[in-house]
């Protein structure tokens, strides 16, 4: 029997030393599930609400005891006795309990921790790994990693405006080989930075944050590192950017302080298009600000037929926001962050909507992570084809890569590495 007989939450720490919620679920047959909730540094205005205590005398206001209490009282009292295999029903019950459009009452961190722990317990009851339980027989695609190796913007103290510069080993034959390629590029880049007297300390997501003067200088350095590592930029290793443009958008303009320019939305679109023409950039995340819908339309019309344009702050893994974007022709890809929406069921609904509309999907971590590797399983379960989970440093990031390596091994001959086909209709 898969009835829930015990549900318990606790406050633990994430990779940035901030509190987060961890939930344990125990079923009648003894099956057990545990999930820890990630947290973002730069969050979209339309995300579900992460419940924090606000007590400045404890964890500088970032404690999550209110969310923990919500799990241990309100949520537990309601879910005890329910069948863990009825995931959608359980998620719906929690949404009804909360009763707000953005999970502000119980907190998305309380609801998500419970939702994922329930799924893990149900998978354990069936003797299945989470990826197989959620994805079924169609789950066999290993995602191409987007490896964040250079940081700027809000993730770094340097003049670079763009937040993340990533490499994608699209030419590898397997996930394990892709991870090896990424590691070799990462270490080659580290050596190159050191030889130039630049910092090789890593940020929240394991990427370097050197004092490089401009976006193009950063791209040139990465291109050189790819080549020195023995790979062909574009053909074997593609580039990807996360602009996090909302962070430097004000009064209708994009203020690129590092470039010393202020651009209109149309000029920003042209700026990004020029970068794509000069470098093998196949994917751009949040190229426009979350509420600059006209800018998103201009960017999509300009390069959306050849470059993956990923909506993070634009869509926040929310089906209603995504439906709006599909209707208006904004972007062509969905970034999937489970804590932006707050339940497994809603996450799967958003991915399904994106796929049906011909949008690609990218499973993603947050800057505040834990050793929990759930997103690796979900990337395979949903056939996302791409995963964004940091650099080749920090154990909280490597936990996801290592889990993907295990999943690829479990799948055996049925495993399929997405490769360049991860870009869907944009593949070339």
Swiss-Prot record:
Catalysed reactions, as listed in the record: (2R)-2-phosphoglycerate = phosphoenolpyruvate + H2O
Keyword Metal-binding: yes
GO terms of molecular function: magnesium ion binding; phosphopyruvate hydratase activity
GO terms of biological process kind: glycolytic process
Top-level EC class: lyase
Keyword entries, A-Z: Cytoplasm, Glycolysis, Lyase, Magnesium, Metal-binding, Secreted
Principal subcellular localisation of the protein: cytoplasm
Location of this chain's protein in the cell: Cytoplasm; Secreted; Cell surface
UniProt cofactor(s): Mg(2+)
Residue positions binding Mg(2+): 242, 285, 312
Binding site for (2R)-2-phosphoglycerate: 163, 337, 366-367, 388
Xref: Pfam families: Enolase_C, Enolase_N
GO cellular component terms listed in the entry, alphabetical order: cell surface; extracellular region; phosphopyruvate hydratase complex
Entry annotation: catalytic residues: 205, 337
EC number: 4.2.1.11
Cofactor binding note: Binds a second Mg(2+) ion via substrate during catalysis.
Superkingdom classification of source: Bacteria
Pathway(s) served: Carbohydrate degradation; glycolysis; pyruvate from D-glyceraldehyde 3-phosphate: step 4/5
CDD domains: enolase (cd03313)
Family: Belongs to the enolase family.
Database matches in HAMAP family: Enolase
Summary of the function given for this chain in its UniProt record: Catalyzes the reversible conversion of 2-phosphoglycerate (2-PG) into phosphoenolpyruvate (PEP). It is essential for the degradation of carbohydrates via glycolysis.
NCBIfam families: eno
Name of protein: Enolase
Originating species: Erythrobacter litoralis (strain HTCC2594)
